[in-house]
Amino acid sequence: MKALSKLKAEEGIWMTDVPEPEVGHNDLLIKIRKTAICGTDVHIYNWDEWSQKTIPVPMVVGHEYVGEVVGIGQEVRGFKIGDRVSGEGHITCGHCRNCRAGRTHLCRNTIGVGVNRPGCFAEYLVIPAFNAFKIPDNISDDLASIFDPFGNAVHTALSFDLVGEDVLVSGAGPIGVMAAAVAKHVGARNVVITDVNEYRLELARKMGVTRAVNVAKENLNDVMAELGMTEGFDVGLEMSGAPPAFRSMLDTMNHGGRIAMLGIPPSDMSIDWTKVIFKGLFIKGIYGREMFETWYKMAALIQSGLDLSPIITHRFGIDDFQKGFDAMRSGQSGKVVLSWE
């Protein structure tokens, strides 16, 4: 079958021909319809330090997808041929304390689809049926293909009560923009997003944020004054991994504020911990999605009117995958969707 693989320990992704995956007793075989390119896939393409330590070569990559069930393991119940599905890309052990307690998103033995095992950038994918999620008929293939990153946004944004709150989102990448849209949709008062990339700030404006702030040109404190905010932000969603953005968030949080961190900062990032202590801030780390509460919330948010369509800015057939990666690497894109049909 046709697949996109990391073939060499160098920059690039290559179109390859690989055997179709075998279906285990508890697995589903999925014929892929659409896939989306994640920032993780760009890291793998670039072959950065993290990728060199993490990714086995050669391997089929990718973990954002929607497809159709075409094969079912003999122990699987609850699925039928033709079901349209996406799936949780974190495969968990089922045996550790967190898994047994129902906190599977905190499994210490998590394996990533397209990271530690073959991924979805292929004509067919096998995953455990436990990880599959049926897509409602009124959600398009394009939107279903970005459920994985949308789930990161939903998990981060809904970590805290947002109704009536002032929310700061640092980082206007696709996940940050989707998190901002979720916050606004569920009843936040002011949702302010910051970045230095004007293309992505304009995407955030299309998604309905209160203010999209280019911090290279505007002062965040001036924006707060413009909005009549006198006590700081109640909730911070750190999506950038950029130390200056996180320090600015600490400066502008209200006392008792709550911060959810999805962005991955440098391991040696320094901050003024006295601000965390004396402001009584709560900081929560986010990894992936809650299984499977986040998935149900994603479907419900879209079905209740949240419009994510502006975040998908580029669409290509799979034979033009290089154009998709070029768009992602340029920084002048939202989500990029590749069609396998």
Curated annotation (Swiss-Prot):
Pathway note: Amino-acid degradation; L-threonine degradation via oxydo-reductase pathway; glycine from L-threonine: step 1/2
Classification via Gene3D superfamilies: Medium-chain alcohol dehydrogenases, catalytic domain, NAD(P)-binding Rossmann-like Domain
Residue(s) at site: Important for catalytic activity for the proton relay mechanism but does not participate directly in the coordination of zinc atom: D148
Binding-site residues for Zn(2+) 2, renumbered to this chain: C93, C96, C99, C107
Any one GO cellular component localisation term in the record: cytoplasm
Binding site for NAD(+): I175, D195, R200, L262, G263, I264, I286, Y287
Keywords: Cytoplasm, Metal-binding, NAD, Oxidoreductase, Zinc
EC number: 1.1.1.103
Location(s), subcellular: Cytoplasm
Family annotation (InterPro entries): ADH-like_C (IPR013149), ADH-like_N (IPR013154), ADH_Zn_CS (IPR002328), GroES-like_sf (IPR011032), L-Threonine_3-DHase (IPR004627), NAD(P)-bd_dom_sf (IPR036291), PKS_ER (IPR020843), Zn_alcohol_dh (IPR050129)
Reaction it catalyzes: L-threonine + NAD(+) = (2S)-2-amino-3-oxobutanoate + NADH + H(+)
Subunit structure: Homotetramer.
Protein name from the UniProt record: L-threonine 3-dehydrogenase
Organism in which the protein naturally occurs: Klebsiella pneumoniae (strain 342)
Organism lineage string: Bacteria, Pseudomonadati, Pseudomonadota, Gammaproteobacteria, Enterobacterales
Gene that this sequence comes from: tdh
